[in-house]
Amino acid sequence: MDFKDYYKILGVEPTADEKAIKAAYRKLARKYHPDVSKERDAEEKFKEANEAYEVLGDAQKRAEFDEIRKYGGQHGRPFQAPPGWESRGGGGGFEGGDFSDFFSSIFGGRSAGGNPFGGARQQQRSAGRRGQDVELELAVFLEETLSKESKQISFQVPQTNAMGQRTGFTTKTLNVRIPAGVTDGERIRLKGQGAPGSGGGANGDLFLTIRMAPHPLFDVEGHDLIITVPLAPWEAALGAKVAVPTLDGKINLTIRPDSQSGQRLRVPGKGLANKQGERGNLYAQLKVVMPPASDESARELWTKLSEKAAFNPRTQWSK
């Protein structure tokens, strides 16, 4: 088992605050998002970033990782957890998901609170022989909230004998529909889909906690989506038609003459769906991007414009 230095994975210092850690995670999640990155190992790096944020984004796990880091583990080098460490996890163990053996050996008894690809935790029930409930954090991409197709999930459930004693774990696979209007952190109950009961007891339930995966193009505000639309200066000045991506295909957006950076254009019905299936808005936020003036002809054009244009962007300073 190799040691994983989660600070190195996210590219932050051990002294980084919560804001810096979250920003680093979002940057990597966007860069290696499976829908965007063409790198061969993008999915693995995406999962690795999620695992790092699962630990460093949780104060308790981060403190424990900092403690075990003192034992001299080096990133990518063989590592063995100190004797007795695993016992700190307490009751039923966390099994697999997409987290590494290193994570499981250090936090084996804890839940997988932020794993966007899913990770089960078992909650021990003391009453009767009812099967254990299983908690699964499930990554949902924005496109999936509009899809009518089922999503296949796999997770670990504990097995018990007739005496209610745990005998091991088994993998269970389900096809689930993502309901319209789901939001980050929402908890969905699937009755009877948890661990089997013993001695004729009822099955436990499966609880899905939705985690909306970061998208490389869109930010989310409620059921509205925000996309930044880069414009050339002449497009903003003269007006243009620009092809803008949405969750269900591109649209042609009309840019009016004299548009400014920061302006928002509303596109009705191109946001996320609510519980009733009604969709929010897409807001296209304009951003004027300056081209490089690296060659002589470009500089001549800018020089002529500066000489002929009666424009002072700082007139408010003279008031």
From Swiss-Prot:
MF GO annotations: bent DNA binding; unfolded protein binding
Stored Gene3D superfamilies: DnaJ domain, Single helix bin, Urease metallochaperone UreE, N-terminal domain
InterPro entries, alphabetized: DNA-bd_curved-DNA, DnaJ_C, DnaJ_domain, DnaJ_domain_CS, HSP40/DnaJ_pept-bd, J_dom_sf
Protein name per the record: Curved DNA-binding protein
Compartment(s) of residence: Cytoplasm, Nucleoid
Keyword DNA-binding: yes
GO biological process: chaperone cofactor-dependent protein refolding; protein refolding
Alphabetical UniProt keywords: Chaperone, Cytoplasm, DNA-binding
SUPFAM superfamilies: Chaperone J-domain, HSP40/DnaJ peptide-binding domain
GO CC term (a single one): cytoplasm
Role noted for this protein: DNA-binding protein that preferentially recognizes a curved DNA sequence. It is probably a functional analog of DnaJ; displays overlapping activities with DnaJ, but functions under different conditions, probably acting as a molecular chaperone in an adaptive response to environmental stresses other than heat shock. Lacks autonomous chaperone activity; binds native substrates and targets them for recognition by DnaK. Its activity is inhibited by the binding of CbpM.
Superkingdom as given in the UniProt entry: Bacteria
Pfam family, any one: DnaJ_C
Major place of residence: cytoplasm
Annotated source species: Pseudomonas putida (strain ATCC 47054 / DSM 6125 / CFBP 8728 / NCIMB 11950 / KT2440)
Domain J positions: 5-69
